[in-house]
Amino acid sequence: MATKLIKHGSKAREQMLEGIDILADAVKVTLGPKGRNVLIEQSFGSPKITKDGVTVAKSIELKDKIRNAGAQLLKSAATKAAEVAGDGTTTATVLARALAREGNKLVAAGYNPMDLKRGMDLAVNAVVEEIKKSSKKINSQEEIAQVGTISSNGDKEIGEKIAKAMEEVGKEGVITVEEAKNFSFDVEVVKGMMFDRGYLSPYFVTNSEKMVAELENPFILLFEKKLSNLQPMLPILEAVVQSQRPLLIIAEDVEGEALATLVVNRLRGGLKVAAVKAPGFGDRRKAMMEDIAILTKGELITEDLGMKLENVSIKSLGTAKRVTISKENTVIVDGNGDKKNIEDRVLQIKSQIAETTSDYDKEKLQERLAKLSGGVAVLKVGGATEVEVKERKDRVEDALAATRAAVEEGVVAGGGVTLLHASQPLTKLKVENKDQQAGIEIVIEALKDPLKQIVENAGENGGVVVGKLLEHKDKNYGFNAQDMQYVDMIKAGIIDPAKVVRTALQDAASVASLIITTETLIVDEPSSDKAEPMPMRGGMGGMGGMDF
């Protein structure tokens, strides 16, 4: 067991804050319409250029263990904001740094950290309520395009394409992003389906940066029962390995030995595979699996019809152009199903909707209908170079997530204005003691920082602009950093999704509270010895690299 380095009190917190400063300084330059790019060295290939806060944060690992602990805590605020709302990562980073730094100063001055935390929590909850009160629902294509434009750092084309994609498949529809083979940026609607089941093991992930499993041109095996032993599947698995194509297994469940064997073979490269649970429950699960079978031109392997896994041939497997699996969802794009069969299935579901008297059944049938007939909108992002395409694709993905958040919870005035004006009612909050009051004041000051940073990235004095805006009673009055003018932010179309602003603040406060209430830090002591790398083991011979 490695020896440990133990630090206590203000020394531990100060070193953690040094790590937080290093990460925050790298991330904050990306904030706002005039934020700068960050160039990140890759382990192979050309460097990555990005203006996405969470991408910058994820790339940072510090040599000093204690400073790194602080940096990793701050990174978790950005990552959580990205997971929940898809955007607001830089705002979360700026807020968390401000809250943690001011909180630590007060702890060092003798304030009670637990009361400071209570005061901060009271203030954050009050600001969240203010954000909810001031949010405005969006409906029009123009408003959707505005959110997409702002979230992609002012790229109008991205905003317009996202609005067009939502018009094609609906606001709740499935929209994916992929790289184009040319210079253009297009929206294409293809046959596809999304269901709410993710991968059964993170070891199936092929893209570790986004934590998704991406299968190109896969076979799809649909099995009605649980899979706990792969012995009956050996003939079909060997046929798939020979074809050199990936395999997606959709079953009631894949467990125990079967799951372990698939994972081992996936890691050793013998079999490109992923497994997910079938969507739905009971009879509805079977119906949805039949929908997938029709969409992908496969067969549902069901013992009711006397079918057995050992007798299944590759002809019984469905196929699709691409499958993307995240922790929570599976998207099947461009299944190779027969158009006539899909249309017949759609008509069958429509007639079931007309006949049913249960509101619940009707709702579930309509969900199936939407999945089968709605299709998937694909945003195809092109560019002159690989670096440009990847950078733009990142911005499109961020903008799409932010637009979905805006549709869900509405929008508020952007540019840091909502957080700034939400700080004003906090002075009226009633607390039990001066330490809790100090916690509220920490939040009031921190809420100015995102706007200050946006203004400073545009080359102006942030403190002067903040002072000028606080003199105004209009909560939508703000500073347009793009045109360097004071405007009504809502009328000017400078808006942020309420969910993004809310999540950024809550995640930042959570991380800052952890830091100011930390008294002892334990990390591994740095070691000069380098461990020998483990040799890679191959699969067993005679099975095409598979190991069963």
Swiss-Prot record:
It is found in: Cytoplasm. One of its GO terms (biological process) is protein refolding. Residues 527-548 are annotated as: Disordered. GO terms for cellular component: cytoplasm. It holds the Pfam family Cpn60_TCP1. It is an enzyme of class 5 (isomerase). Its main location: cytoplasm. Its EC number is 5.6.1.7. Forms a cylinder of 14 subunits composed of two heptameric rings stacked back-to-back. Interacts with the co-chaperonin GroES. This is Chaperonin GroEL. It comes from Rickettsia conorii (strain ATCC VR-613 / Malish 7). The lineage of its organism: Bacteria, Pseudomonadati, Pseudomonadota, Alphaproteobacteria, Rickettsiales.
